Amino acid sequence: MKFWSRFIGLILIAAMAVGCGITHSIPQGKYLLQKNEIKPDESVPRDERITADEIGRYVRQQPNKRFLGTNFYLWTYFSANPDKQNWWNNLKRRIGEAPVYLDTLQTERSASNIKIYMDSRGYFNSEASYSIDTTSRRRAIVTYRTKQGRPYRIGEIRYRFRDRFLAPIILEDTAASLLRTGNVLDFTVLDKGRSRISTMLRNSGYFNFTI
């Protein structure tokens, strides 16, 4: 028990020391990106809600990696002397990670990308906004909030064939189709449906066709 208490105490002391060292290394006027928070639209039913993980893929800036709750990689990067070329400093540069400073242009682009993604999922006129909180220690937390638009749903599915020989091949496999009436008009699902039909036709010996 004493060992773990001392170990945890050392970790906390190291974390405080690392944090102070990093703060002094951050240039004036810049903020270290500490965290991205994503707030999905909880007014949407869970089975149709676009999740934080999905939204997070469209956030362009990600904070530095952490180790045992500390900015170890960032501290290692800052502690390397750029004017000295030796194995110790080279090792620090390889292990370390360059700081990710808040770039509001990238933040705006992230919000725009999130909106485009939600629209492509069938939730047209969606909204994506963000807010930035900064601290006296020159850290920044970016919070992205989303509002999914009213979903457009598939009312009817029709197939039109220029080549009548294709009809039985495609219609025979409609049970495996990803498209269902009543589902949200998700363009990512439409693309998967096109790919599925293309693969099926090629496997049947057809190569010159358009979908």
What does each model-found stretch correspond to?
Residues 3-4, 21-211:
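Interaction-mediating elements
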